[in-house]
Every structure is written in C-alpha cells, then in structure tokens.
C-alpha cells in the first residue's frame, strides 16, 4: 500500500456522502483516492480509556470502509507533540489530557491505526501540523518540549506560538520528526496541514523582522521571502522522506480549490505548482 509513483499529491477530504452505501464489485478505479480525516484536536480522544478508544477507532474505520473510503488521514502531531511513541516530542494533551503524560496502559495510537488500516486494505497517512506549537497561550507545554530548550526558534502571533519558518533550525527539527516517523512506522504518506505561514491577523504583522534581516538577503519583499522559506521546507521534507523510505508520498491540505492557486499563494504563502514541477 504505497504511492511510489507520486512525490506529492493534493489531499481532498470527501466530506459528502461518507455514509452512503459503497458500490459493489470493481466500480471504483484502481488508483482512485477516497480519503477521510480523523482529527485529534476536537477532543474526541482526550482522557478516554484505552480499550474504549480503540473500540471507537475500529468502529470509525469499519464505517468508513463500508462507505468506500480507502485512505485514512490520522492526526499524529497537532502541537509539536505526538499521538505516537515519539523519540523527540512529548505525548499530546489531545490523547491523555496533559502534554507529556504517557497513556496508561501504554499504547501507540499511530501504530494501532496503521495496523487496523492495513487490515482493511486502507492507506494510512500520518497527518502533522509542522509549525504550530500552541493553539492558545493558556495551554501548558510539557517540561520536555523543545520550546523550553530553544525558545529562540519560536514566535508568538496572536494567541498562538509557532516555529519560525525562516530558521534553518526549525526546518531541521521538523525534518527530524518526519524522518523518525517514516523510518519507524509503515506509513503510506506524510500529510501536512497548515504548511504555510499563519493566516494574517488584521493589523498585526507576523513577527519575523529579525529573521528577515538575517536571512532575507536577495529578496526585495517579505512575501517572496516567506514563500521561499516554505519552498525550502517542502524540498527538505521531500529529500528526507525519499532518503529514508524511498516511496512515501507527501500530501498537503488546501482550503481553496486548485484553480485559485495564484490568489491563495498571496494569502497562505505556498507555491504548489512549483513543487509539482520541480520535485
């Protein structure tokens, strides 16, 4: 269950019709991609006893399989944390209720979901949020969180904290996380949500003046420079994944149709057509 022929793909959530009866026989083309997201940030996992949560996930997979879904995009890294046994980041508060607290009894949700998906001939896509660290400043970070070791890598924007996308150290850390995932887990793809700079807050500029002064040589404006920073991360992730696994795909999430790429580039700072052409 790999996507060896694709380096990048646009992942579409099939929001409509997931409860419909799946066509019988070979009604679907062999390579048609029919995916559904299972997210963690809505709180559906938090504090649920392990066996009950496993039963819930199995029930969701059975329903989605019956609806014809053949790929699951499962959120494993919402806030530079982990819904898996990470070697580099703390357990997610969206699993146990407290960041850094191990599940009890110990289990690995990503490994469990990989096994259950593959039993059903479904692809498993590991969904990460690369830059986001805090969705609210009120949230507490675990003592082992990378933020405490390297606060200079991060910026506060509005009520949230992010890796500074301009810093080589930020990119290296994100690539290290992805390398760990693809080398230890049988994932079929890495799926990136919020791969771009944060959506603008009216009247508040993203606080990267110091980074622009340090790394912005050769760019006449921040917009082009920020696009370049995102492009560098995508290229490095591509190289990381191909170097470690040789076959996994990279997906990215859009909230606008592809025909609006030029406009969305100005807003979310991504150049998808460039990635397709060059990587």
What does each model-found stretch correspond to?
Residues 31-33, 39, 43-55, 115, ...:
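Active-site-adjacent "subsite" loops/lids of carbohydrate-active enzymes
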Residues 70, 77, 120, 142-144, ...:
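Polysaccharide-binding and catalytic clefts of secreted carbohydrate-active enzymes
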Residues 11-20:
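Hydrophobic h-region of N-terminal signal peptides that target proteins for export
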Residues 2-9:
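Sec-dependent signal peptide recognition
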């Amino acid at each position: 269950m790999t996507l060896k022929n694709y380096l990048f793909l646009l992942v579409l959530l099939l929001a409509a019709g997931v409860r419909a009866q799946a066509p019988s026989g070979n009604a679907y083309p062999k390579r048609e991609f029919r995916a559904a997201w299972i997210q963690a940030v809505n709180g559906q996992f938090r504090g649920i006893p392990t066996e009950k949560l496993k039963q819930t996930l199995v029930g969701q997979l059975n329903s989605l399989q019956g609806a014809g879904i053949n790929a699951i995009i499962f959120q494993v890294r919402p806030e530079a944390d982990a819904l898996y046994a990470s070697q580099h980041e703390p357990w997610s508060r969206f699993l146990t209720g407290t960041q850094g607290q191990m599940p009890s009894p110990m289990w690995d949700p990503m490994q469990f979901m990989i096994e259950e998906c593959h039993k059903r001939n479904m692809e498993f896509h590991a969904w990460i949020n690369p830059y986001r660290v805090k969705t609210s400043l009120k949230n507490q970070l675990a003592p082992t969180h990378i933020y405490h070791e390297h606060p200079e890598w991060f910026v506060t924007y509005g009520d949230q904290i992010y890796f500074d996308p301009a810093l080589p150290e930020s990119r290296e850390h994100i690539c290290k996380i992805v390398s760990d995932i693809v080398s230890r887990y049988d994932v079929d793809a890495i799926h990136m949500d919020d791969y771009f700079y944060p959506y603008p807050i009216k009247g508040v500029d993203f606080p990267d003046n110091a980074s622009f002064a340090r790394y912005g040589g050769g760019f006449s404006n921040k917009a082009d420079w920020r696009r370049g920073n995102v492009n560098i991360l995508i290229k490095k992730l591509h190289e990381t994944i191909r170097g470690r696994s040789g076959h996994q795909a990279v997906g990215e999430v859009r909230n606008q149709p592809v025909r609006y790429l030029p406009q969305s580039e100005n807003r979310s700072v991504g150049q998808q057509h460039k990635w397709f052409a060059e990587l």
